[in-house]
Amino acid sequence: MRAALIVLWMLLCSVSSAVAQVSIGINLSLYPELVPVPGYPVYYAPRMEANYFFYDGLYWVYQGDTWYSSSWYNGPWWIARPEVVPVFVLRIPVGYYRRPPVYFRGWRSDAPPRWGEHWGRDWERRRTGWDKWNRSSVPKPAPLPVYQRQYSGDRYPRLEQQHPLHSQQYRYQPRDTVVRQHYREQAARSARTPAQRGDQGALQQGSDRQPHQEPPRGQGQGQEKGRGRDEERGRERNR
């Protein structure tokens, strides 16, 4: 019991340091169709070409060997390190990943991915018991935040608008201790100004907003040359 409490404490302490806001290339114009995974408190998106799930009040995406979470269907997305991914997300059977990575090949479709084999012994030691549970006492799936269907396209809220809307229209409180920590961290960050977050407003939604865009090739050089000619003419007039 004591060992389990120590592991849980380590997980909670690492959640905040694991969270970072990123753009993952998912750009949904409408609320996705979400279907329950039989026997699990999880939903998946059968029509999406993405490993897109919903569990305990948050959306979860597995992409590029990384887990991401968000309280809104189109992000922004926050990194969840392997050490702080909820166990029922880790337990989702391989067959419900719509874009399974290459290393899933050969694994049973009705069983969870072999995360210990993939992430190594150190991870497996920290997350011991993740793949063992009483299937007769699985919690019920959380209700979907279907109010978000009315927020699509240009109506999709900015980060600072999301938490107030969510808290007003979605009364469900996460049961999972780790999810509650993720949820609190995301809510706290959304309450900050862009300057306080340090995100420069560039990573709000999907792939249409890039963290950095370089000017067209030659444009910066042309501007520098133009400024140089203007300065030279000014010096000639002052002589």
Residue ranges of predicted features:
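Short helix C-cap/helix-to-loop transition motifs enriched in small/turn-promoting residues
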Residues: 2-3, 76
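Eukaryotic N-terminal intrinsically disordered, low-complexity segments enriched in Ser/Pro
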Residues: 168, 187-188, 192-203, 207-215, ...
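Bacterial N-terminal signal peptides
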Residues: 3-14
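Ser/Thr/Pro-rich, intrinsically disordered low-complexity segments
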Residues: 219-225
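Sec/Tat signal peptide C-region and signal peptidase I cleavage site
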Residues: 15-20
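Short, low-complexity, Pro/Ser/Thr/Gly-rich segments in the mature regions of secreted, periplasmic
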Residues: 227-238
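Low-complexity segments
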Residues: 21-189
